[in-house]
Design a protein with these regions (language model features):
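A short helix->loop->beta-strand "cap" motif at the edges of active sites that frequently abuts
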Residues: 23-24, 97, 160-162
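Conserved catalytic-core segment of nucleotide-activated headgroup transferases in glycan assembly
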Residues: 40-119
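Generic beta-sheet signal
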Residues: 1, 29, 103, 166-168
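Donor nucleotide-activated moiety binding/catalytic core segment of transferases
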Residues: 103-159, 169-170
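Short, charged/polar "capping" segments at the starts of alpha-helices
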Residues: 8-10, 33-37, 67-68, 108-116, ...
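Catalytic binding pocket for nucleotide-activated donors in carbohydrate/polymer assembly enzymes
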Residues: 34-39, 52, 61, 118, ...
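C-terminal alpha-helical cap of glycosyltransferases
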Residues: 226-247
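Active-site and donor-binding regions of nucleotide-sugar-utilizing enzymes
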Residues: 1-40, 153
Length: 247
């Protein structure tokens, strides 16, 4: 069962090769019958009134690694001092800065990243506990800010939490069809290459984020991209149970 994002989308992934060689059956989130969503079904959908009542802006950072570059791309958001989230936070207005909660990736390097944040912006930043589950933070957020194509993107899409993605990556490591659909999110003000423009959008639209999200989440390009991430099935438990019994 798939338990993390970005399995089918990369052009090359050792994990995929191993799974295809040694697994009898693979249940992916994109399974045509909707039998691969086991991981995602632990989440409940968020309701629009909840979004409107939430105040928090959640900055959810990707893994920043000092080595192991087979796992991390050589892009700004994987660099401890060049992460675009720094500029995004810098250009938020004072009110929005106070609404920010930063959730660093649960990894040993994150303690050092936390120190960099504090050095840049002193102690005027709220941090979530590094190894805590992101689940509660998703449901308490009016807007989530991510900087990578990874599991949080899929989780946010599934739950329905408004989010923006900031990344100047050209995504050459991903399949072309996937990237084409992803880049169409720019016109919907979801995907940004510039953290400054992303901050301007949030400053200008914070009060109406829920209304914006209600509109864009019904757009054709949004739905097409969402459908590349996972397939939903209402009677999933019954269906997967029957499937496994018959294997």
């Amino acid at each position: 069962f798939q338990h993390g994002g970005l399995i089918e989308e990369p052009k090359f992934l050792p994990q995929k090769i191993v799974e295809e060689k040694y697994s009898t059956k693979r249940y992916l989130w994109t399974d045509e019958k909707g039998l691969g969503q086991h991981f995602l079904t632990r989440y409940k959908k968020i309701l629009y009134p909840s979004i409107k009542n939430n105040k928090q802006i959640l900055i959810f950072s990707t893994l920043i690694s000092y080595k192991k570059y087979t796992e991390s791309n050589l892009i700004k958001n994987n660099h401890p001092f060049l992460d675009q989230n720094y500029d995004f936070f810098k250009y938020l207005n004072k009110e929005n800065k106070n609404r920010v909660l930063i959730k660093l990736f649960p990894h040993k390097t994150s303690e050092n990243i936390k120190k960099i944040w504090k050095k840049k912006f002193r102690n005027n930043i709220n941090f979530a506990e590094i190894h805590s589950s992101p689940k509660v933070y998703f449901y308490n957020s009016r807007l989530a800010v991510i900087n990578d194509i990874s599991t949080p993107l899929y989780e946010l899409m599934y739950i329905g939490v408004p989010f923006i993605l900031i990344s100047d990556n050209n995504f050459n490591e991903l399949e072309t069809k996937f990237v084409k659909k992803l880049k169409k999110l720019e016109k919907l003000k979801i995907l940004y290459t510039s953290p400054i423009k992303a901050a301007e959008f949030v400053n200008n639209n914070y009060d109406t984020i829920d209304d914006w999200w209600k509109i864009v989440s019904k757009e054709k390009n949004f739905i097409n991209f969402k459908n590349t991430l996972f397939t939903e099935k209402k009677d999933y438990i019954n269906s997967i149970t029957k499937e496994l019994i018959n294997i």
